[in-house]
Amino acid sequence: MHTFSKFKQYYYGIIMSQLTRFFLLAFFYYIYPVEIFPQDIPAFTDQQLIANPTDAWITNGGNTYNQRYSPLNEINTENVGSLEGVWMTHLNGSGIGARFSGEAQPIFYEGIIYVITGEDDVFAVDIDTGDIIWTYEANLFDGIEGICCGWTNRGVAIGDNKVFIGQLDGQLIALDKDNGDIVWSVQAEDWRQGYSITSAPLYYDGKVITGFAGGENGIQGKVKTYDAETGEHLWTFFTVPNPGEIGHETWPQDSEVYKYGGAPVWQTPAYDPDLEMLYFSTGNPGPDFNGWMREGDNLFATSIVAIDSNTGEYRWHFQQVHHDIWDYDAPNPVVLFDIDINGELRQGLAQASKTGWVYILDRTDGTPLIGIEERPVPQDPRQATAATQPYPIGDAFVPQEVDIAPEGYPELVNQGRIFTPFWTEGTVIKPSHNGGANWPPSSYNPNTGILYVCATDRMSFFRGGEPEEIPPRLEGRFLGGRFGAVPNFISGVFAAMDMTTNRIVWQQRWADRCYSGSITTAGGLTFVGRNDGRLTALSSRTGDSLWEFQTGAGMNSPVTTFNYNDKQYIVAYAAGNTFAGSEKGDNLWLFTIDGGISDISMLDSMSGLENFDLSSSDMANGNTIYASACSFCHGVDGEGGHGGGIALMSASNPGYVIDRIRNGFNAMPAFNGVLSREEILDVAAYVTNELASQ
């Protein structure tokens, strides 16, 4: 009589249940033949778009208020410890290359998960099985230049039986939800002129709106809106105004620098159908670090902007940084909410910025809800600096000055405080140009009034005063100076901010940058990813960590949650990120309570890799190869070495280790063809059995 291990019994049960399900379905469809297609995706109403998501997640922000809040509470603080994987699907290796980053938040509707990779490939995945239903392959031109901040895509939009995507090459495309075929496509902007699309489009009222990245490439920022049915262009709003438009007077009148003045829109706008307004924040003006070329406040750069959702006409703006010379753009998505302030219900808006502040405004007219003071700041006439800057009342969620000067850099000026000017001699300043709150989305709980912000604490060295050509050279950047993060002084900050006071409720400091974004739920949980591959669930009230799961690649995108067949699920896309230095992957995970997969090591037999057996591998030979080829980067004992490789203490999944040795990831080279199959297995055996067991 054979005795099955618990592990084998688990997979035997899965196989038998799937076979039973298959034959029952086959018999049913033999008797009652029907065609199987995904359910229709409607032209969503305004009420559907602003509702808190329950049985679906139909917009990038959960709703068009961009709150990323779920009213579901089946998964909660009491049972989250039992949260386990249901399945993990590989997305055909898409987006694993060194240049790509996985930042997309999945969409879910009627049993189908829609996700896009850093290669702009789209996958429709069956929630019941994890099977890929269809794939759209973008086949991007490999020679695209001028992409800022990695080849990435932050999500898709759905509506009217279509899946909408923006691509790095400047195309806006509508796909058939049944098969991924192109319904229509438009060349919204030209990548050769510095434009790209990295954000998820927004579907609303039969329209699709998208912004454009490229603020370092000499673009003229804008958002464009199209007819969702036909792709017809409806209107454009320029974030750097043309002559005769509101705000053009804040640019030099004797120069065409405004045509290359930046102010990109990095993220998906928010939408309030009752006020008939769209809201978004903008990036820095260009050239970034040479202010004398663009004297004036430079509207609408580094601003929050509201426009008419029907016509695109200007409604109001609030500029966070006047005449920005620090690259303090505002890529974090705008969040809308209604909140009680001093006994009065107000229609609010919040945006967490690179400056380290949350800007809280009345979304009807752009006036501050909490208070924002204009204060004098240090001056440098060579930079044509603004006389004052806005200072929100409340707490900064990251430090805004340098406590101790870093070794090897010039003496601090003004203690490296925010808004310290610089010129050709350069200086160190906090926050960094890529500190504070970057693109990773914030989440908001409407019941508590708490905004959860994912941020980075770091300092940068700024140098300005370099002239730029007008028009800019197409093959170069339009910076007007130099910048660089000061190494070894980087940490992550995850903060809970009270929107009635703009004060910190609680705060966590991480050893690495926070680069994923979050969602928050009525179950008292806030989910946020980590660069080392962990998906974590925190107590929304205290910030305590209640659960974590190793996903096998950098967890650098927000997760999605929904109810399906009376059960709450969470879907996570773990693909790594070049800027975060995290491991690359193509892993799409589904989780629920008692899902069955308690650890990634249980996936060995389902990984899709070729069959392997490490039992006869030569670990001594693996040790020898590791010492000569791997230890410099990963450390003699797998603790992480001078070459910047990750620590290997958690590398216990043989299939995963073999895949990484064979194919490489990030800066790690591929050893397929360099090492024989037996040598790869020897190294994998040594890593998983010796190093990972420490």
Residue ranges and their predicted role:
Residues W57-G61, R99-D121, G146-Q171, S196-N217, ...:
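Repeat-blade elements of multi-bladed beta-propeller folds
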Residues P42-V86, N242-I246, Y409-F422:
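Blade/loop signatures of beta-propeller domains
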Residues N623, G635-V674:
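Gly/Gly-Pro-rich "capping" loops immediately C-terminal to redox-active cysteine motifs
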Residues F44-T45, L603-I625, G641, Q694:
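Electrostatic cytochrome c docking/interface patches
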Residues K222-E232, D297-T311, G492-D498, D586-D594:
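Beta-propeller blade signature
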Residues T560-D604:
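Blade-level signature of beta-propeller repeat domains, shared across WD40, Kelch, NHL, RCC1
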Residues T89-Q105, T135-A157, S185-A200, N217, ...:
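Extracytoplasmic beta-rich repeat domains
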Residues G166, I661, G673-Q694:
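C-terminal capping alpha-helices of c-type cytochrome domains
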